[in-house]
């Protein structure tokens, strides 16, 4: 293949040059590429759009919560209905303890809340937790979903990240973060992720390049 037609994948190029101290990499964008593509996110959204079984309803709710809040796995499985609040400005919030032991809030859309109610309407349960285990063949009682259980569920969705790695719960946080960084900017993304500062968010998710062609229209060809 000629040099003109040979295009190296960005991730391979970056990994190769990360070992070259002569040309140190930018610190920005260290998590760049660890999320899912827009196409994969839309594929998952469509896959979970018409649930029938309890497991399918749970998959839809998990995808909606993780893809709209960017919560970590431990935070997702800790969510409770008793921690749902109404903000003074009208938004529905859920409170939780984030990494570092600090109280935080995330917005829960009507779509997410209605999906959670549909999921819980499938069985007679007084559980306060958003997500529960499924009884399975042994008809074991439902219990609050564990972090390990969440990991297995998300792995079973069987899609790959931008870097070709198998999906895991944090992939959805990366996906949301990259989308918000690109469209809403560092301050907004930082607030949604509950980072301590926008500088931390930029370190992880600011792309190591920018495409000016999105804004330039000098050429009329």
Predicted regions and their residues:
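DNA breakage-rejoining catalytic core of tyrosine-based enzymes
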Residues: 23-44, 100-110, 124-128
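Short, basic (Lys/Arg/His-rich) helix/loop patches that form interaction surfaces
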Residues: 48-53, 151-191
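Active-site/catalytic core of tyrosine-dependent DNA strand-transfer enzymes
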Residues: 41, 110-163
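Short hydrophobic short-linear motifs embedded
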Residues: 6-16
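Short, polar N-cap/turn motifs at the start of nucleic acid-interacting alpha helices
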Residues: 84-86, 164, 185-204
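Conserved tyrosine-mediated DNA breakage-rejoining catalytic core shared by Y-recombinases
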Residues: 78-114
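Basic, Lys/Arg- and aromatic-enriched nucleic-acid-binding interface segment
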Residues: 39-69
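DNA/chromatin major-groove-contacting recognition/catalytic segments
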Residues: 15-18, 203-221
